[in-house]
């Protein structure tokens, strides 16, 4: 009986420690008030309204990025996005930015039939993996969508509204270092909203 009690206490202690550790390493990337903790790249519009982070095409109609000040290696990123107008955007990870040139990997966020949830390598190999076309039905254009991105060593998995979109293991990704960044595509006429950006550090 005593041994069972000790075992039970051990299991409870491990669970509480795990929960505490996860709480300690999770944080909000967007404070809902301003762009503190982020860097704007390019001339496209990034602003906060009603607690939402909004990107919108500017007069130059070029690529634009909003990158974290910090680098993140292994993590789970949860966020919500809502596409208005064209809504062509993306979420970059382990990326570096020079002006409006970004090197790294993008989780696609795009209108229907454009591979949302897939992985694209910028200024490199291009598309590494696209979701099965049947999964495009999980995207709710014009509504709030939940995107989850897990990056751990050389493995990346994405989920859209609770549905796994892709999983890929890639040695080059595994060696990557850099920021998380949100993208607005070039061409003009684009608007997207973001909220509830939460990151759990897995290092």
Cite the ranges covered by each PLM segment.
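Carbohydrate-interacting regions of secretory-pathway proteins
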Residues: 20-203
């Amino acid at each position: 009986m005593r041994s069972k009690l000790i075992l039970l206490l051990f299991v409870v202690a491990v669970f509480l420690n795990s929960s505490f550790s996860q709480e300690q390493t999770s944080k909000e990337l967007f404070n809902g008030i301003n762009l503190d903790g982020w860097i704007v790249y390019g001339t496209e519009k990034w602003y906060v309204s009603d607690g939402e982070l909004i990107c919108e095409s500017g007069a130059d109609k070029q690529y634009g990025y909003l990158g974290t000040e910090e680098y993140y290696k292994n993590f789970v990123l949860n966020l919500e996005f809502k596409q208005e107008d064209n809504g062509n955007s993306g979420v970059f990870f382990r990326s570096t930015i020079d002006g409006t040139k970004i090197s790294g990997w993008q989780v696609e966020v795009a209108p229907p039939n454009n591979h949302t949830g897939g992985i694209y390598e910028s200024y490199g190999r291009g598309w590494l993996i696209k979701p099965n076309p049947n999964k495009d039905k999980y995207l709710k254009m014009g509504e709030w969508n939940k995107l989850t991105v897990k990056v751990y060593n050389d493995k990346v998995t994405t989920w859209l509204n609770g549905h796994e979109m892709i999983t890929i293991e890639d040695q080059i990704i595994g060696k990557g270092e850099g920021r998380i960044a949100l993208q607005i595509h070039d061409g003009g006429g684009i608007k997207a909203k973001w909220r509830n950006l939460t990151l759990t550090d897995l290092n």
